[in-house]
From Swiss-Prot:
PANTHER family: THIAZOLE SYNTHASE. Its EC number is 2.8.1.10. It is found in: Cytoplasm. InterPro entries: Aldolase_TIM (IPR013785), Thiazole_synthase_ThiG (IPR033983), ThiG (IPR008867). The gene is thiG. Keywords: Cytoplasm, Schiff base, Thiamine biosynthesis, Transferase. HAMAP family: ThiG. Pathway: Cofactor biosynthesis; thiamine diphosphate biosynthesis. This is Thiazole synthase. Belongs to the ThiG family. Catalyzes the rearrangement of 1-deoxy-D-xylulose 5-phosphate (DXP) to produce the thiazole phosphate moiety of thiamine. Sulfur is provided by the thiocarboxylate moiety of the carrier protein ThiS. In vitro, sulfur can be provided by H(2)S. Homotetramer. Forms heterodimers with either ThiH or ThiS. 1-deoxy-D-xylulose 5-phosphate binds at G167, A193, G194, N215, S216.
Length: 265
């Protein structure tokens, strides 16, 4: 059995392996209760949402940033230049919220408006520049093992391959590539986007992912508070299963009660 440890990102330790987003909730009250139910420690915030004042200031004031670590994201950026500018704004927001040492950024560069698929070239370009500016970069990418390795090599602190398109709830569509990324990676692998139900979160963790990031599946559930708890349980169960080690698959049946040294009189 493997030994468990805390999730380590950029020199910080986190007990929870479930990261959560703050968008799409029906109210800030539902969001806050859902965040509490997930027991998450890392919360993503869309910097552009705050910049455009779409309830952004209210969001910053509502969340207790002594309890949660802010992960500013560059959602809405379509090229590397935009992403770099928004990342710098995000770092300032974290400082204004009391997290002076927070250099984290979830890097998203998405020019594709229909499927919201990330641009690998612009992501790699932005990541390299942000790392040189002392950011802890968590890049959102397609499930591309080669890109994931290149991002690791230039100094990214995690890679965040998508399970399926953002908000689609389609689950993990490319298990093979995700497994390769996990196998080859020396940094945490966080599955981001597409998870719809706790069993899919558990599946990601069973594969050996270091964590998952979930937003839509909780916020858009019929009962977000219950789904938040369920996702928490799913991530924990999947992690325990990974550490325990699954039974080997076999072509033939193997009786659980073998008839060995049993005498019948």
């Amino acid at each position: 059995m493997k030994e468990d440890s805390c999730l380590q990102i950029g020199g910080k330790s986190f007990s929870s392996r479930l990261m959560v987003g703050t968008g799409k909730y029906t109210s800030s009250e539902v969001m806050l209760e859902s965040l509490a139910n997930t027991e998450s420690e890392i919360v993503t915030v869309a910097v552009r949402r705050i910049q455009n004042n779409q309830n952004g200031e209210n969001l910053l004031e509502k969340i207790d940033w002594k309890k949660f670590w802010m992960l500013p994201n560059t959602a809405g950026c379509t090229n590397s230049d935009e992403a770099i500018r928004i990342a710098i704004l995000g770092r300032e927001l974290a400082k204004l919220s009391g997290q002076e040492e927070n250099n984290f950024v979830k890097l998203e560069v998405i020019p594709d408006k229909k499927y919201l698929l990330p641009d690998p070239i612009e992501t790699l370009k932005a990541a390299e520049i942000l790392i040189n500016k002392d950011f802890i970069v968590l890049p959102y990418i397609n499930a591309d093992p080669i890109l994931a390795k290149k991002l690791e090599e230039i100094g990214c602190s995690t890679v965040m391959p998508l399970g399926s398109p953002i908000g689609s709830g389609q689950g993990l569509l490319n298990l093979s590539n995700i497994s390769i990324i996990i196998e080859n990676s020396n940094i945490p692998v966080i599955i981001d986007a597409g998870i719809g139900v706790p069993s899919e979160a558990s599946q990601a963790m069973e594969l050996g992912a270091d964590g998952v990031l979930i937003n839509s599946a909780i916020a858009l559930a019929k009962n977000p508070l219950k789904m938040a708890k369920a996702m928490n349980y799913g991530v924990k169960a999947g992690r325990e299963a990974f550490l325990a080690g699954r039974i080997e698959k076999q072509k033939l049946a193997n009786a659980s009660s073998p008839e060995i040294n049993i005498s019948i009189k």
